[in-house]
């Protein structure tokens, strides 16, 4: 939002079929474009940010189908061009690709070699409290359609304390929501 650039998330956890990313061939009933084409269409710009979450949790039960798509997407020789099975060529050369993973040993070595690793540390309790006050609580109130509902800071602080075993804020977000 701050950069005024479209931001899209692609959840990779458990994904085993590249058709989710690259679409289905037109010969199939209910064929449609893939998630990457959808992002290109929704963005209406050439430089969206695409956040691939849980890279280390891509399913390899059917081989490296999804991983191979990501390897191709990050290949400097392909220049960010992909072929959606439904729509055809898609240019993502201007996109910024961000990948998140917890366990680097579970990421395909060829793909890992193409990524610049930026290690992040978890949030402190005070940072989590600020995130809860400024973002998570207001978002939960908006979703509930209950109007303007206040929450005592001490209550949020207790929720943060109970969720302190995680470095991120995923469980905190679920608890506040």
Question: What residue ranges belong to the model's regions?
Answer:
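Walker A/P-loop
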Residues: 1-12, 41-42, 71
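Short loop/turn elements that form and flank the Walker-type P-loop nucleotide-binding site
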Residues: 3, 22, 43-48, 64, ...
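Helical "lid/switch" subdomain of P-loop NTPase nucleotide-binding domains
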Residues: 3, 32-33, 48, 54, ...
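Short glycine-rich substrate-engagement loop in P-loop NTPases that contacts/grips substrate
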Residues: 12-44
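Conserved RecA-like P-loop NTPase ATPase core
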Residues: 21, 53, 70, 97-100, ...
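AAA+/SF3 P-loop NTPase mechanochemical coupling elements
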Residues: 43-47, 51, 82-102, 147-152
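Conserved C-terminal "switch" segment of AAA+ ATPases
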Residues: 44, 103-113, 117-174
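Conserved catalytic/switch belt of AAA+ P-loop NTPases
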Residues: 51-91, 113
């Amino acid at each position: 939002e701050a950069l005024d650039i479209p931001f899209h998330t692609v959840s990779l956890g458990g994904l085993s079929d590249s058709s989710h990313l690259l679409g289905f061939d037109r010969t199939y009933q209910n064929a449609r474009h893939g998630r990457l084409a959808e992002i290109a269409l929704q963005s209406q710009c050439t430089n969206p940010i695409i956040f691939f979450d849980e890279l280390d949790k891509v399913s390899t039960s059917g081989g490296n189908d999804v991983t191979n798509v990501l390897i191709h997407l990050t290949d400097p020789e392909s220049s960010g061009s992909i072929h959606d099975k439904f729509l055809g060529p898609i240019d993502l050369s201007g996109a910024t690709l961000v990948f998140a993973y917890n366990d680097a040993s579970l990421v395909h070595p060829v793909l890992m070699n193409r990524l610049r690793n930026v290690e992040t540390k978890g949030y402190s309790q005070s940072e989590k409290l600020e995130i809860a006050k400024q973002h998570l609580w207001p978002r939960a109130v908006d979703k509930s359609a209950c109007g303007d509902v206040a929450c005592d800071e001490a209550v949020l602080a207790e929720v943060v304390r109970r969720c302190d075993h995680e470095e991120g804020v995923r469980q905190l977000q679920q608890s506040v929501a």
